[in-house]
Swiss-Prot record:
GO MF term list: SMAD binding
Gene Ontology terms describing biological process: mesenchymal cell differentiation involved in bone development; negative regulation of osteoblast differentiation; positive regulation of myoblast differentiation; protein export from nucleus
Quaternary structure and partners: Interacts with SMAD1, SMAD5 and SMAD8; the interaction (with SMAD at least) increases when SMAD1 is not phosphorylated and mediates SMAD1 nuclear export.
Keyword Cytoplasm: yes
GO cellular component: cytoplasm; nucleus
Keywords: Cytoplasm, Nucleus
Gene3D superfamilies linked: Pleckstrin-homology domain (PH domain)/Phosphotyrosine-binding domain (PTB)
The protein's role, per its UniProt record: Nuclear export factor for BMP-specific SMAD1/5/8 that plays a critical role in terminating BMP signaling and regulating mesenchymal stem cell differentiation by blocking osteoblast differentiation to promote myogenic differention. Directly recognizes dephosphorylated SMAD1/5/8 and mediates their nuclear export in a Ran-dependent manner.
Subcellular location: Nucleus; Cytoplasm
InterPro entries, A to Z: PH-like_dom_sf, Ran_bind_dom, RanBP1-like
Name of this protein: Ran-binding protein 3-like
PROSITE patterns, sorted: RANBD1
Positions of the RanBD1 domain: 276-417
C-alpha cells in the first residue's frame, strides 16, 4: 500500500517550530508593558522602473508560512529599496500586499535567521490584526490539531491577564489599539467586561427604585392612631381641671377616619390639595408716617448731591445724595411766606439738610449744574457753605425759586424797617405835643387864681437869684 502524503505535511515540522517561536515571543510581550514601543526606521528610496526579480522568490515563500494560496504580487512602478535586514523579504511600498502578509513574512524570516540587529529605524504604520477566532481557524487549517491546542492555551493565558488588568485596559483603550496582537485581544476582552458593568448597574438601580416616591406615606411610619389618641386624652383631662379655658374636643372616630384618609391619599394628591387651599395672608397694621411736612406745601423736588465746604482743608466733602425739597410753610400775620430746604439721604432717609430761608442768605450759581448757598448745619447749628449739584434744568429751577423768595424776604424786611421808622417818628411827635399841652394848663390855672402875672414873674426871678 502506498501512502499518499497529505498536502502541506512536509512543512508541518517547520510550522510547529515557528508556532513555538511565536508563543515565546508572545509570552515575552505579556511580561512587558501592554502598549508596544514604536520602532522608527528611516528609509532611503531609489527609484526603479522595472520589477525586481526578487518578487518571484517572495511569492514562493508565502505558502510556507501561513498556508495562503500563491498569488502574483505586483509592485508599483516606483519602489524603494529598504536597507533594513528584516524587511528584505517583502517590499513595504507594495500596494497590493496586505499588512498581515507582510508581518507574517517578516516574522518567519526573523525566526529562521535568528535575531538581527537593526542598522536603521523604520517608521511603521499601525498593525491591524485579525480577530482571535479567525486566526485560530487559519492555524487549524494550516498546522493541525497540535497547533490548535497551543492556540487554546494561549487564549486561556490571555483571558487570565485580561481579568487582572481589565481596569487598566478600559482606561487606555484608544492607546491599546496600536499595540501587538496580545494587547488587542486583551482590549477586546476588557471592553466586553467593562461594557457589561453599566447594564448590571442599571438593573440594580431599577430594582432599588421600583415605584418609590420620597416622602410618601410618612404617616404610616411616624404617626399612629394610638399616638394621636393618647395626647388627646391628656388634653381632655387637662380641660376638666381648668373649665374656664375652651379646648376643642375631637372624637376618636374622627381621628381614625382622618388617618385612614391620609393613608389612602398619595403624595401627589395631598400636594394638590395643599396647593388648592387658600393661602393665609398676614395683614400688617398701617402706621401713619409723620415727617413734620404735613402742614407744608411742596414747591420743588429734585434729585441731587450735597457737598459741604471744609475751611480747614479748603475742600468740598460729600454729605450725601437724595431728594431735595423746597417747602413753603403757612403764612404769617403779615402775609409773608416762610420757606425751608429739606434733604434726606437716599436709602436710609436720614436728614442731612434742614434750613430756613432768611433775607441775609447768600445764593450763587457756580455753573450750569452747581449752586452755592449758605445754610445752617445740623451738626453744630452754625452757618456753613453748601454746594448743590444736579442737572442743568433742575439747577435753574432751584436757583430761580430760592432767589424769588429771598427777594420777597428782603423787600419785606425793608418795608418793615420803613414802617418802624415811621412809627418811631410818630411817637416822638406825640410826646412833644403832650408836653406843650401840660405847660398851657399850668398857665391857665395861675390866671384863674387872680394873681398878677408881673408879680409872678418877679417872684420867679427872685427865686432864681
Amino acid at each position: 500500500m502506498t501512502t499518499i502524503p497529505r498536502k502541506g505535511s512536509s512543512h508541518l515540522p517547520g510550522s510547529l517550530h515557528t508556532c513555538k517561536l511565536k508563543l515565546q515571543e508572545d509570552r515575552r510581550q505579556q511580561e512587558k508593558s501592554v502598549i508596544a514601543q514604536p520602532i522608527f526606521v528611516f528609509e532611503k528610496g531609489e527609484q526603479t522602473f522595472k520589477r525586481p526579480a526578487e518578487d518571484t522568490l517572495y511569492e514562493a515563500a508565502e505558502p510556507e508560512c501561513n498556508g495562503f494560496p500563491t498569488k502574483r504580487v505586483r509592485s508599483s512602478s516606483f519602489t524603494f529599496h529598504i536597507t533594513d535586514s528584516q524587511s528584505q523579504g517583502v517590499r513595504k511600498n507594495n500596494v497590493f500586499m496586505t499588512s498581515a502578509l507582510v508581518q507574517s513574512s517578516v516574522d518567519i524570516k526573523s525566526a529562521e535567521q535568528g535575531p538581527v540587529k537593526h542598522s536603521k529605524h523604520v517608521i511603521r504604520p499601525a498593525i491591524l490584526q485579525l480577530p482571535q477566532a479567525r486566526s485560530c481557524a487559519k492555524v487549524r487549517k494550516t498546522f493541525g490539531h497540535k497547533a490548535l491546542e497551543s492556540c487554546k492555551t494561549k487564549e486561556k493565558t490571555n483571558n487570565k491577564i485580561s481579568e487582572g488588568n481589565s481596569y487598566l485596559l478600559s482606561e487606555n483603550l484608544s492607546r491599546a489599539r496600536i499595540s501587538v496582537q496580545l494587547s488587542t485581544n486583551q482590549d477586546f476582552l476588557g471592553a466586553t467586561s467593562v461594557g457589561c458593568q453599566p447594564n448590571e448597574d442599571k438593573c440594580s438601580f431599577k430594582s432599588c427604585s421600583s415605584n418609590f416616591v420620597f416622602g410618601e406615606n410618612m404617616v404610616e411610619r411616624v404617626l399612629g392612631t394610638q399616638k394621636l389618641t393618647q395626647p388627646q386624652l391628656e388634653n381632655d383631662s387637662y380641660a376638666k381641671e381648668k373649665p374656664f379655658k375652651s379646648i376643642p374636643k375631637f372624637p376618636v372616630n374622627f381621628l381614625s377616619s382622618r388617618t385612614d384618609s391620609i393613608k389612602n391619599t398619595s403624595l401627589i394628591e395631598s400636594a394638590a390639595a395643599f396647593s388648592s387651599q387658600p393661602s393665609r395672608k398676614c395683614l400688617l397694621e398701617k402706621i401713619d408716617v409723620i415727617t413734620g411736612e404735613e402742614t407744608e406745601h411742596n414747591v420743588l423736588k429734585i434729585n441731587c448731591k450735597l457737598f459741604i465746604f471744609n475751611k480747614t482743608t479748603q475742600s468740598w466733602i460729600e454729605r450725601g445724595r437724595g431728594t431735595l425739597r423746597l417747602n413753603d410753610t403757612a403764612s404769617t400775620d403779615c402775609g409773608t411766606l416762610q420757606s425751608r430746604l429739606i434733604m434726606r439721604n437716599q436709602g436710609s432717609l436720614r436728614l442731612i439738610l434742614n434750613s430756613k430761608l432768611w433775607a441775609q442768605m447768600k445764593i450763587q450759581r457756580a455753573n450750569h449744574k452747581n449752586v452755592r448757598i449758605t445754610a445752617t448745619d445740623l451738626e453744630d447749628y452754625s452757618i456753613k457753605i453748601f454746594l448743590i449739584q444736579a442737572s442743568a434744568q433742575d439747577t435753574a429751577y432751584l436757583y430761580a425759586a430760592i432767589h424769588h423768595r429771598l427777594v420777597a424776604l428782603q423787600s419785606f424786611n425793608k418795608q418793615r424797617d420803613v414802617n418802624q421808622a415811621e412809627s418811631l417818628s410818630e411817637t416822638a411827635q406825640q410826646l412833644n405835643c403832650e408836653s406843650c399841652d401840660e405847660n398851657e394848663d399850668d398857665f391857665i390855672q395861675v390866671t384863674k387864681n387872680g394873681s398878677d402875672p408881673s408879680s409872678w414873674t418877679h417872684r420867679q426871678s427872685v427865686a432864681c437869684s
